[in-house]
Amino acid sequence: MEEKQILCVGLVVLDIINVVDKYPEEDTDRRCLSQRWQRGGNASNSCTVLSLLGARCAFMGSLAPGHVADFLVADFRQRGVDVSQVTWQSQGDTPCSCCIVNNSNGSRTIILYDTNLPDVSAKDFEKVDLTRFKWIHIEGRNASEQVKMLQRIEEHNAKQPLPQKVRVSVEIEKPREELFQLFSYGEVVFVSKDVAKHLGFQPAVEALRGLYSRVKKGATLVCAWAEEGADALGPDGQLLHSDAFPPPRVVDTLGAGDTFNASVIFSLSKGNSMQEALRFGCQVAGKKCGLQGFDGIV
């Protein structure tokens, strides 16, 4: 029997990336070291990483027909990512972002043209055959619709024996009030440093203690904190930690968080413990920060 896939639901965007030797001053002309088009977006990047790690994965998100979408779909396919779940929208444009990556310290500055493209709806998600997937990861975006999607997965799981249940993770990355309702769904909840700080918590350990009451019974809350590594808190009340694994030189942090999330999901889906998954996530994300793009993370 064919192995079930991991499905990532969320954003895909065209990243036009300019790599510079130092961050440009306003109102000056500069040459860049290199420029590339790269498929981006949190869920999209996580698919790239899952595929590179050897997982069978699929992407679900919105695209509008046109040259940009053609490039993105071709790149998904070249990476071995299943795009049969993509929602094709008749209105709006595929989003695009201009990214400045500072080669001297790896910082990334993103200017997103977030177009009028509708997000995937609960109605779109009704068409998904849940039996095809062993894990579904949802990047928090249009949360009120995504809650309905998560409830559909819960209803499906209630009728399944344990080995057939779909495992679920959610990511709460942006400090938007609407997204916070997603805390109470999923067995793994990734909360970002930005959200933790927005809610008044730092460092990661304090965020986990302060926010754990929001997750559902039995869930694990995970918080990565850049060069300080990552922490997790599960139902047993034990705080887990992994140090970061910085590369010899940081050159590109664009997509590092998406790399961490995907690597944790990959490790857990293989039956590893949360401690092992946390360490693996930090290792792969650290390696990615020493590379332009994602090739070479494994």
Curated annotation (Swiss-Prot):
Pathway the protein contributes to: Carbohydrate metabolism; fructose metabolism
Keywords annotated in UniProt: ATP-binding, Carbohydrate metabolism, Kinase, Nucleotide-binding, Transferase
EC number: 2.7.1.3
Family named by the database record: Belongs to the carbohydrate kinase PfkB family.
Any GO BP annotation: fructose metabolic process
Function: Catalyzes the phosphorylation of the ketose sugar fructose to fructose-1-phosphate.
Name of the molecule in the record: Ketohexokinase
CDD domains: Ketohexokinase
Gene name per UniProt: Khk
Taxonomic lineage from the root: Eukaryota, Metazoa, Chordata, Craniata, Vertebrata
Catalytic activity: beta-D-fructose + ATP = beta-D-fructose 1-phosphate + ADP + H(+)
EC main group: transferase
One Pfam family cited in the UniProt record for this chain: PfkB
Binding site for beta-D-fructose: D15, G41, N42, N45, D258
Record Gene3D superfamilies: 3.40.1190.20
Binding site for ATP: R108, A226, E227, E228, G229, G255, A256, G257, D258
Reported regulation of activity: Requires potassium. Inhibition by ADP.
